């Protein structure tokens, strides 16, 4: 079983395509980014996702993506939008893990050897998942650069993680077989000209599912 997250969704149509394709998680970005969405629009998408998932008798988790935001604002948005999980993609301290419980907390790491990252690598609470992304100076994700699969595979042997960084419908199967992650995360890899592509979303989910069988 592989968990598939489609991140950076900004429209209801793309969110519903992800649900229909079989995605397990949909990421809504609240951090400065070209994929940023305002909380009111996100709440509309979240409601549509829940209805579509219920119709299919499936559970689809809504994940809010934040970068160096404060806990109070994160919790406020999470409540407004009915989020299931929080992804921290900045330099947040490990104390956020306890502050944001019982939400699922996904912490992005990039093997940059920073002190806060070492703290998160030592954190082992049941509601925390690590997300391995590529180390791109000045970027907090969505850059389309492939992560370090060797280090990710080593970490995946010790704890469940999501693999991100440069994944596409063409390479996600290889990534799953090599790293054996708990889940995979894609954003730019299912876009055409900077916009989510319905066909690529479907192809990505299908390729991930086939590789995990």
Swiss-Prot record:
It comes from the Bacteria. The keyword Zinc does not apply. InterPro entries: Aldolase_TIM (IPR013785), PRAI_dom (IPR001240), RibuloseP-bd_barrel (IPR011060), TrpF_fam (IPR044643). Keywords: Amino-acid biosynthesis, Aromatic amino acid biosynthesis, Isomerase, Tryptophan biosynthesis. Gene3D superfamilies: Aldolase class I. One of its GO terms (biological process) is L-tryptophan biosynthetic process. It catalyses: N-(5-phospho-beta-D-ribosyl)anthranilate = 1-(2-carboxyphenylamino)-1-deoxy-D-ribulose 5-phosphate. GO terms for molecular function: phosphoribosylanthranilate isomerase activity. Pathway: Amino-acid biosynthesis; L-tryptophan biosynthesis; L-tryptophan from chorismate: step 3/5. Belongs to the TrpF family. PANTHER family: N-(5'-PHOSPHORIBOSYL)ANTHRANILATE ISOMERASE. This is N-(5'-phosphoribosyl)anthranilate isomerase. It comes from Roseiflexus sp. (strain RS-1).
